[in-house]
Regions:
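Active-site glycine/GP-rich loop and adjacent strand/helix microenvironment
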Residues: 1-47, 52, 60-67, 75-82, ...
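Active-site diphosphate/adenylate-binding microenvironment
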Residues: 27, 31-95, 106-111, 118, ...
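Non-catalytic, beta-rich accessory domains that mediate macromolecular interactions or localization
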Residues: 84-85, 104-115, 238, 245, ...
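Conserved helicase ATPase motor motifs in RecA-like P-loop NTPase domains
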Residues: 96-102
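Short coil/turn connectors at secondary-structure junctions
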Residues: 105, 141-143, 242-243, 269
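Short strand->helix junction
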Residues: 114-117, 423-424
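DNA major-groove recognition helices of helix-turn-helix
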Residues: 123
Length: 503
């Protein structure tokens, strides 16, 4: 009997629990909230806000402010220095380092032992549960998982306390049994130098029976190209004939889809999106025919949502899951078993279904262009690029865009810098197709483009190969969960990359 067939029954019971998402969402979420309030009742934060398991949702919302990282930073800094019972009971030993705020280079997100197990590892387990339920023929565990991670370092030299990429913290604490079905070895997986790591992974994984991949599409693509180079072949199934699925997350997969289809041309290759972040594991694509993800309702995360049109108001409406609507953009607010309380994570989502709750990620609260009232979000950009690529046969590797407030003629427009893995025959035609697609997708953009009165046609600039890689390297952000900002209301990022583009 294959190992996959042997372990499959252990996942069956969990599948029955996941089926409750359609009918018991409110009950599941209230159970999570009660558990979080009970555990935090004897913490400093819990005492400050009067937490207990008897608290109702309305009381919790009335007593607890919506918080940004800056507002929790003082508490987190004390936790990082070893103080206990601050935002979560006991000492929190792990901190996931992610991109910073306007005042700090990096954020340090607490990851408690509870959070590791009831959220992050639970997400990995449930990805397998749903995958096996959809693919009874799978032989997932008969080979190895190539899991791409970042690196970590000691946290203020406190014993057994680490700070670094979430993926590295997960690898460091993973059940030893998982190492039997994982590659590369831990030493290689946790290397800090991504370029050395990529070569070592390729060499180690080359002769393994890899059946599945897990990681960020952009960084995984770099590793897979190295594998092909080491093997001297041009398609991945020539190296790993039993490869069957890529569990991906961290960035939108749309810009990379065609490149993966060319690298892995075998029929039946599967792709499953996951919504895992430093702050928690929130969603899984349970149906390959539906791009939306199911919201994970029984982890250590309680969800709330702020309508995007109210985000900047002094007293925005904050909605629990049972009050959201489909088709509306929301900023996500989370309360977690790692001590984040009504934390504005910075991601925006739109629900596509309420039974069960399914959603798509539409962007970031800070990654958008709204310099002229056009309200362009990352979801619009991804869809527009996909349409332009489909029409021209081009393939986009990386991109960023920002407003030009006034050019030499006093005109305003959007400026796009795009690195292609396959260039369009006519860059101007590609730009026109993108501009037209954005107008179809976004009525506010269309209104501002009307007769070129407010916005001129977008400007498309071609990036030299590797310039985005070089920019990330200059920031010390190769590998892990680092990514290029797609859209910005400011020109800082695009100006830095444009300067490097001239080199």
């Amino acid at each position: 009997m294959s190992l996959t067939a042997l372990v499959r029954p252990f996942f069956y019971r969990r599948q029955k629990q996941l089926d409750l998402y359609s009918t018991q969402a409110r009950q599941l979420q209230m159970h999570v909230l009660k558990r979080l309030l009970s555990k935090a009742s004897d913490t400093e934060w819990g005492h400050l806000h009067g937490y207990s398991s008897r608290m109702s949702y309305d009381e919790f919302a009335a007593h607890t402010p919506v918080s940004s990282y800056e507002e929790l930073k003082g508490y987190i800094d004390r936790m990082r220095h070893g103080q206990k019972d601050i935002l979560w009971p006991g000492r929190v030993k792990f901190y996931a380092k992610s991109s910073g705020t306007t005042s700090d280079k990096s954020k340090f997100i607490p990851v408690s032992t509870d959070g590791l197990h009831d959220t992050h590892y639970a997400g990995g387990r449930d990805a397998v549960v749903w995958y096996l339920s959809r693919h009874p023929e799978s032989r997932l565990f008969d080979g190895k998982a190539l899991i791409l991670g970042g690196s970590h370092a000691p946290n203020y030299n406190l014993p057994h306390s680490l700070v670094g990429d979430l993926s590295a913290i997960l690898i460091e604490n993973i059940n030893p049994l998982v190492n039997l079905v994982r590659t590369p070895c831990k030493q290689t997986a946790l290397l800090a130098d991504f370029e050395e790591k990529r070569k070592r992974i390729a060499q180690e994984a080359l002769h393994a029976n890899v059946t599945n991949l897990s990681g960020v599409p952009s960084w995984m693509l770099s590793v897979l190209l190295q594998v092909l180079e080491e093997a001297g072949v041009d398609r991945l199934e020539q190296v790993w004939p039993n490869l069957e699925v890529f569990f991906h997350g961290g960035v939108a997969f749309t810009p990379y889809r065609e490149q993966y289809r060319k690298l892995i041309a075998k029929p039946g290759m599967n792709y499953m999106e996951t919504y895992n972040a430093s702050e928690g594991f929130f969603g899984l694509q349970d149906d390959p025919s539906d791009e939306s993800m199911s919201l994970m309702l029984d982890y250590g995360v309680f969800y709330e949502f702020i309508p995007m049109d109210q985000l900047d108001s002094p007293h925005p409406e904050v909605l629990p899951i049972w009050d959201v609507e489909t088709g509306r953009n929301y900023a996500m607010v989370i309360t977690t078993s790692s001590g984040l309380w009504r934390y504005l994570i910075g991601d925006t989502v739109r629900f596509t279904s309420l039974h069960p709750y399914k959603f798509v990620i539409t962007g970031r609260t800070k990654f958008f262009i709204n310099a002229f009232g056009e309200e362009l979000i990352v979801d619009n950009a991804e869809k527009g690029l996909a349409e332009a690529c489909a029409a021209t046969g081009a393939q986009v590797l990386e991109y960023t865009a920002a407003p030009v407030f006034m050019d030499e003629q006093g005109k305003c427009r959007h400026q796009w810098l795009v690195e292609f893995s396959k260039e369009p025959a006519d860059l101007d035609a590609f730009a026109r197709l993108l501009d037209e697609a954005l107008q179809r997708i976004n009525s506010d953009y269309e209104a501002k483009r009307y007769k070129d009165i407010t916005l001129q046609p977008l400007q498309m600039l071609k990036a030299r190969p590797g310039v985005f890689h070089d920019w990330l390297k200059s920031k010390g952000k190769l590998g892990g969960q680092h990514k290029v900002p797609r859209l910005s209301n400011k020109r800082d990022t695009i100006e830095e990359i444009l300067t490097m583009n001239k080199d």
